[in-house]
Amino acid sequence: MNKVLEEISKIGILPVVVLEDAKDAKPLAHALCAGGLPCAEVTFRTAAAKESIAIMRKEFPEMLVGAGTVLTVEQVDEALEAGAQFIISPGFDEDVVKHCIEKNVPVTPGTCTPSDVQKCYRLGLDVVKFFPAEAAGGLKMIKSISAPYTQMKFIPTGGINANNMKDYLEYDRILAIGGSWMVKGDIIKSGDFDKVEALTRQAVEKLREVR
C-alpha cells in the first residue's frame, strides 16, 4: 500500500473540507492539527480549493493534504500543482485514475457497487472510497461488497458522524472514515476554529476507543 494511504490509515479519520475562502485554510489546518487530525481532503467544489491546498501544505508541512471531488484530469493537475498528496473522486473515472497512476499519486475513486470496486481492482488499486456511505447501504453494504475483494480497503464517506463513526472503524476493512461534522461550513464561516479543534479532539477520543 502507498505510504500516504498508510499514514491516513494510522490517523483513522479524514476531514472532508469545503472552503469558500482560502483565508480560512491556515486557521482551519491549525485547528485540525491541534485537535489531533493532521490531514484534510480539500474538495474541489469551490474556486478556493487549489489555493487552500497550497497554503496548508506550505504552513503545515507535517500535514497530509489531498484534493477531493476531483472530476477531471485537469483538476488532478491543478491539485498536484498546489501540492496535493492524494486524490479522491466521488465516482470512478478511468481517465482520472490512470492519470493519477501515471503521476504516481495515490487515488481513491468513489464506489458503491461491486462493479465499481471491480474496475478499481483491475487497475491495481487496493483502497477505494465508498460513497455516499449511509445512503448506499452503510457498513452492511461495505461488508457485502468487500467479501470477494479480500485485499481491498475502504474509506466510507457520506452520512458518517460522531454517533456512527465507531461502528465503521471497528470493521477491519475500513482504512479510515471520511467526515465533515468537525469542519462544517457554518462553523468555518463563523470563524469559530476553537470549535473545530474541540470537535476534532472529541472525534479522536472516540477513535481511540476502537483503534
Q: What are the functions of these language-model segments?
A:
Residues 86, 90-96, 129-139, 173-195:
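Glycine-rich phosphate-binding active-site loops on the catalytic face of alpha/beta enzymes
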Residues 16-18, 39-46, 63-71, 84-92, ...:
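Catalytic beta/alpha-barrel core
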Residues 1-82, 102, 162, 189-211:
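Conserved N-terminal beta1-alpha1 strand-loop-helix module at the mouth
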Residues 140-155:
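Shared catalytic-loop signature of beta/alpha-barrel
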Residues 67-68, 156-160, 177-180:
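Glycine-rich beta-strand-to-loop/alpha-helix junction loops that act as flexible
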Residues 33-38, 59-62, 81-87, 102-108, ...:
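Glycine-enriched alpha-helix->loop->beta-strand junction motifs that scaffold or abut catalytic
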Residues 28, 72-82, 115-123, 146, ...:
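Catalytic cores of alpha/beta
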Residues 37-42, 80-82, 103, 113, ...:
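Glycine/Thr-rich beta-alpha phosphate-binding loop at enzyme active sites
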